[in-house]
Amino acid sequence: MRKTGFLLIVLSTIFLFTGCWDYAEYQQIAQIYSMGIDFEKENNDIIVTLQYISTGKTQGGKVSESITGAAYSAKAKTLIDAVNKLQEATPGNLFFSYLQVLVIGEDAATYILKDIISHIERTPSIRNSAYVIITPGKAEGLISTVDPFNPIASGKKIHNLLTGYPNGGSTFQVTIHEFIQMLVKPGIESVASRVVSTGYKNKTLQESAKVLGGTHEDVKFHLQNEGNFRAFGLAAFKGDKFVGWLDDNESLGLSWIKGKKIKTYKSTKTDEEVNFSTYSKNITFNADVKKILYFYITDSKSKIKVQINDKNPEININVKVEAALRKYYTGEGSEYLTPDIVNSMERKLENSIKSDIMTVIQKWQKELKTDIFGFGFNLYRQHPKEWHRNYENTWEEIFPDIPIKVNVDAKINNTGTNIRRLFIK
């Protein structure tokens, strides 16, 4: 009995002295803000680019807004070997808990995405709240860009760009966790934000200084290019392969379907009704600005309902939108808005939003046959037994032919008597 009591006391005391297995002194770490991964398909080399900030340049444990960090790249046959080479060129321990963005080049997204995700999942220190970015060309070029008018680390700048600006629908944030969930969930394909760098090309700035240790081509230091960033569009995947880009309008259509909280301006024609009984391309607006209505979208949400009739699934998309009409309108008739005019404006706004939705459906259901919408996942969630019995193994084949109905309900809220028709003398 005494031995048992003594053993319990010893075991309970041990728990008071436990520590972190990966503990490191703050002064001995290199804070990683950006991680970029590229692939050279000519020789099957993987290039990893890390942007880090030395803790010696921080103030009181906080990173100064004016610190841009340093960008290093290493080339190897595997991801882990490239990271190890970067560790050899870094005085502090590489510390990924500050990671803001994971940037993947287009070739890497096409050929080695599975290896990238496997490495991320095996590295517990990498934050799954960091954003996944797909960029055309090379990730190392994006990471080594710095805004001369707002000199902060590119990873933090891109993160702020995606979070600090109201969602205009042309792109949206996707975290590592969300991206992996889309990869493993049934009936949905992955998407990720598209970010590009803008600015002038400068030969001197694009040159890289050689770093001692290893061969000169294995590890290099990037002198940062002056430029800025633009986030627009989305990258789409089928399984673990990158398959194409969504442009601004297609991304907006996908945002309507997914129920993203969109804050953006929307314009419609005043003198033409559009027939949406079949899939249609975008409306080409008349250059006459007198025939254009302008709205500001204040709220949006959607609901996807899947019905099964005689084993044939049907997708119903219901989108609700609230909008504000700009202060003046250019229609004919009464000086102030009448209920009939308001109803007509709401119908035109609904048709314009429906056009966005049908455009992205036409391309990705009918042409590329990739379920980036998650219709299959909604079928699985709403009818799990039928999904496993009839659709799980054949969804890719039947998805392009599934009928889709779209209903948009738009409400204009600011239609008081202060909204007057614009008179120009």
Task: Enumerate the predicted regions with their spans.
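Sec-dependent signal peptide recognition
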Residues: R2-V10
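Membrane-proximal alpha-helical signals and transmembrane carboxylates
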Residues: G5-F6, F15-K425
